[in-house]
Amino acid sequence: MRFAAPLVRATLIKRYKRFMADVRFDDGTEVTAHVANSGAMLGTAEPGMEVWLSPASNPERKLKWNWELVTVDGHLVGVNTAHPNGIVAEAVAAGQVAELAGYDSIRREVKYGVNSRIDLLLEAEGRPKCWVEVKNVHLKRGDWAEFPDAVTVRGTKHLAELTDRVRAGERAVMVYLVQREDCAGFRPAADIDPVYARTLAQATRDGVEAICYTCRLAPDGIDLGAPLTMDLTERI
């Protein structure tokens, strides 16, 4: 995925109201940027951090900038949760996700379940449908990438709906996309949301597949990185 325009560096002043952040550009100008992330953003939204912004594509929008990346301990981390679906879709189409190869059709935002939309629906003649849910991961604790960074009732609901697809004889895959490169493995944040962690463990026992990939990040774009080891052991 390429950014439409080069990102501009700034310094984070503060994030507030979840979707807003005040930043200061290198020339001293201060603006309020849009934050496309409803999570807690633990460890990625501390005042003084170096951040990278993209200009809004709509010139009429009130907030003229989008917060895309943040530098944490010398590593770029993606914080815009609007990108993972597109990154994964591009990678699947290019044959870069071995676990999701061999499908002729990729559809996005297809209705299913109870008032839900699946991120990707993969189809091919003679094969069961493959329902793919993508989750953005940016939380790191120790050497582990973890999800979620806040309680996610919606995420737990998605796992139940994926399990229903497996019971219907179809394929369901949970993709955790880690928007950083400095993690040794992935695991659920069981202390933050024990219900989600337990539901994920049960879903995988019931046939839902779970895979995890990192991202390669740069100020000009974000690409799929390497697969990451997963530990889905129940801890709570």
UniProtKB/Swiss-Prot annotation:
GO molecular function, one term: DNA binding
Annotated NCBIfam families: sfsA
Family assignment from sequence similarity: Belongs to the SfsA family.
Organism: Paramagnetospirillum magneticum (strain ATCC 700264 / AMB-1) (Magnetospirillum magneticum)
Annotated InterPro entries: SfsA, SfsA_C, SfsA_N
Alphabetized Pfam families for the sequence: SfsA (PF03749), SfsA_N (PF17746)
Protein name listed in UniProt: Sugar fermentation stimulation protein homolog
HAMAP family: SfsA (MF_00095)
